Amino acid sequence: MQSDRNLSHLNSKGDVHMVDVGDRPSTFREAHAQGSIQMDRETFDLILRGETPKGDVLAVARIAAIQAAKRTWELIPLCHPISLSGMDVDIQPAEHLPGLRLNCRCRTTGPTGVEMEAMVAVSVGLLTLYDMLKAVDPAMTIGSIQLIHKSGGRNGVWNR
């Protein structure tokens, strides 16, 4: 997708700066991001049976994703601290990989979008799964982290 718009994080001199969103109206905004982790069949089966050595890896990954979304502004240098009004994290088996697919939906009402919070949540949730399972499967692969949907603000709705 190409755009004629300028990069908003560069000022007129080409220097990096944090965008001033102070005069933008507060609107409802939503973003959905997704990613996956591929693993050995044996590791996948351990998760499905609830027999992983470190306990409930799915619950820990959900909490990690939520924490990460709330701290996005501390991790991504030019992101604004925003107030999340809601968030859903869903982790589903993906038999064909074999592996897991992690989806995150974030919501806010404010002057800036919530895409980065959803993307960071997916990334950290998947990294947490890797961390908790690496002892049994160090060859796992994280991939396909992508924005699926965003809405709100001046650019309206975008879908992959």
Swiss-Prot record:
Sections of the chain in a coiled coil: none
GO biological process, one term: Mo-molybdopterin cofactor biosynthetic process
Residues binding substrate: L78, C79, H80, M116, E117
Signal peptide boundaries: none
Pfam families with a match to the protein in the record: MoaC
Residue ranges with Polar residues bias: 1-11
Pathway(s) it belongs to: Cofactor biosynthesis; molybdopterin biosynthesis
Catalyzed reactions: (8S)-3',8-cyclo-7,8-dihydroguanosine 5'-triphosphate = cyclic pyranopterin phosphate + diphosphate
Active-site annotation: D131
CDD domains xrefs: MoaC_PE
InterPro entries in UniProt: MoaC, MoaC_bact/euk, MoaC_sf, MoCo_biosynth_MoaA/MoaC, Mopterin_CF_biosynth-C_dom
E.C. numbers: 4.6.1.17
Family per record: Belongs to the MoaC family.
Function statement: Catalyzes the conversion of (8S)-3',8-cyclo-7,8-dihydroguanosine 5'-triphosphate to cyclic pyranopterin monophosphate (cPMP).
Subunit composition and interactions: Homohexamer; trimer of dimers.
Listed name of the protein: Cyclic pyranopterin monophosphate synthase
